[in-house]
């Protein structure tokens, strides 16, 4: 079954002349744990561990994971062509080195930039020489039949006696720091940080009380980008009272495009996906500050 999926993927790669396709363990927010919808690496390799990365080429398929999962990976990969690369062991190439060994100069590397952190993308770019990265390819989504639905849990308000600090107090601290550094906008892509900031919770990821969402904070606005299906009247009223504007999840891209020229934006490249980061970069004159 896994080999059949890999062959389907290779057919799509061939059509677009992609030499290697990289599949991380990630979602658009670089969460440590994933909703079932985003378990693309598990789908293409059969490995169910919570950490790892896969690379599929024309003739090879590899999985990189750490020592916690060596035995599990051996068992789960044994009926497929996927080769286990034991990270940290002597003589085992990194996935960058593997790509350099099997893909020629100016070859094409494909990945889904929606589920790839800019931090890791930059590391990949810095380690593969003159190869070309195409970051708008969701091949796993194209071949995944009966894919689980996207997470859609209902938001709820965390009582202030548990939260310990009001939303306005937290926003004031952020805006004070923004002002001291001359920052016009702060982008937050981490669901746990967003839920902490706004004192809300959800169940979009099993055992993690978070909501898949983005936030953009300016001097005068705080916008929560989230599926409206997750927000009932009570939560909507609560957010409104706290001067938090609600917009649909996908509207983040349009708002990034509308950021005034020469604005200074703060973000975390480890928790910002390539698609979002590039949307900011496309503004040309927008200056990005990061935590790394």
Predicted regions and their residues:
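Conserved small/polar residues in nucleotide/adenosyl-binding loops
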Residues: 286-291
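Acidic, metal-coordinating catalytic cores used for nucleic-acid/nucleotide bond scission
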Residues: 115-117, 271-272
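N-terminal accessory/capping or targeting/presequence segment of soluble
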Residues: 1-104, 116, 120-259
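Extended, highly charged accessory segments
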Residues: 268-282
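Short glycine-rich phosphate-binding loop at a beta-alpha junction
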Residues: 108-113, 263-269
């Amino acid at each position: 079954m896994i080999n059949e999926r890999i062959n389907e993927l290779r057919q799509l790669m061939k059509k677009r002349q992609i030499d290697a396709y990289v599949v991380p363990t990630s979602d658009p927010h670089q969460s440590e744990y994933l909703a079932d919808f985003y378990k693309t690496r598990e789908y293409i390799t059969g490995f169910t561990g919570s950490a790892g990365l896969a690379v599929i080429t024309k003739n090879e398929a590899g999985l990189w994971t750490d020592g916690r999962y060596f035995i599990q990976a051996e068992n789960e990969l044994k009926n497929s062509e996927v080769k286990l690369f034991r990270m940290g062991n002597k003589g085992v190439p990194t996935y960058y080195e593997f790509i350099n060994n099997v893909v020629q100069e100016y070859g094409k590397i494909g990945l889904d930039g929606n589920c790839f952190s800019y931090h890791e993308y930059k590391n990949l770019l810095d380690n593969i020489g003159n190869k070309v990265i195409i970051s708008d390819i969701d091949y796993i989504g194209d071949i995944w039949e009966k894919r689980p639905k996207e997470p859609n849990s209902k938001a709820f308000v965390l009582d202030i006696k548990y939260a310990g600090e009001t939303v306005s107090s937290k926003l004031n601290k952020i805006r004070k720091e923004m002002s001291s550094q001359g920052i016009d906008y702060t982008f937050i892509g981490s669901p746990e940080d967003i839920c902490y900031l706004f004192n809300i919770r959800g169940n979009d990821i099993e055992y993690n009380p978070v909501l898949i969402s983005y936030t953009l904070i300016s001097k005068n606005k705080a916008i929560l980008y989230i599926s409206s299906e997750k927000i009932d009247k009570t939560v909507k009223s609560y957010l409104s009272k706290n001067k938090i504007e609600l917009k649909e999840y996908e509207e983040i891209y349009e708002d990034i495009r509308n950021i005034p020229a020469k604005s200074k934006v703060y973000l975390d490249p480890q928790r910002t996906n390539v698609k979002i980061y590039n949307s900011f970069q496309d503004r040309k004159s927008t200056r990005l500050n990061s935590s790394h």
